[in-house]
């Protein structure tokens, strides 16, 4: 089967790894450095998040899936740059019929106008806090994520970017009716909407490393 589609391969011959271990390889690819168990390096998306101001309400860095390697903690996240540069996580399956991004859900009984009011109240309270440089890193990241969540909840353009129902059934079929295929389509929509970096968890619908065939390759 692989021979039949070999003409479609794009080989990157300059790319190599110093290790055959998957977890260390993840870190190498996502962070551009070898694994250091004492310091977690930031990923490419985190660096882009640092260098480019967020185009509110669209987050600069999005990850589709629950990226937790069995051996290592979230390679490619904020690392030593801080949690504020972690990706916006979408753990829901984009291939499910009821897929939706929970950040767009407002609290029960709270309409958009009240959400805007809460956002302004939060900003007012933040002005009475210490400057960002004097806050704990966790507090700074909490403020960032809260602001991001409120922006998403009140943005029609952001909701549209995450809405796969706007694509034709034919195109969705071409991308593949599975978690990865629909994730690829969603990633394209997000990049077009202004997200600078999107990562997709490479599992299909098996819950394991579906790309890594240690056995059963040949019939």
Kindly label every feature range from the protein language model.
Residues 1-219:
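Ligand-binding pockets and gating/stacking loops
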